[in-house]
Amino acid sequence: KRDGSPFLCLSDFIRPLSSGIPDTIGAFASSIDADMEGLYQQDPYKHLLVQTLSDRLAEAATEKMHEYVRKEAWGYAKDESLSMSDLLVEKYQGIRPAVGYPSLPDQSINFLLDELLDMKQIGITLTENGAMYPHASVCGLMFAHPASEYFSVGKIGEDQLEDYARRRGKRDRKSVV
């Protein structure tokens, strides 16, 4: 990077197996009822409102799930008491990057998460390219590391893409983006 800050990777926020110390990473998925997608098809304004509300509900479910993980399941923030404004600016420990966002842009990760989570149990199906249906669905990973932060992978070179595809066990580099 030009500003001298480090190049980050999500694996920076989880202990390597070679450390011999166990660590935890979480996987999540949330969605709204697929029937919401069909509401108000004849009224573009109301349909857009339903789509927007559906997206917000899926994100809110993820936020609530992350709070449960921080306070109870993993318990590293048992006494956390954040205001709504603190929640909105993510003043909590840990991150939950979603697939397709800047720190986890590879949409093919959805297939791995589907194998782990069996997302069809909550009504999520994947297209051949890994896009989720219903569209108001979100999945990703949870990290508790105190220094974890969101970042953007940014532009990568052909050599990096080929190396990534090889390490993912993919023959064609196009199958990982």
Per-region residue spans from a language model:
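Conserved small/polar residues in nucleotide/adenosyl-binding loops
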Residues: K174-V177
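Small-residue-enriched alpha-helical segments and adjacent helix-cap loops
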Residues: K1-S148, D159
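Residues within the alpha-helical elements of helix-turn-helix
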Residues: R167
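Short acidic alpha-helix initiation/capping motifs at coil-to-helix transition points
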Residues: V153-E158
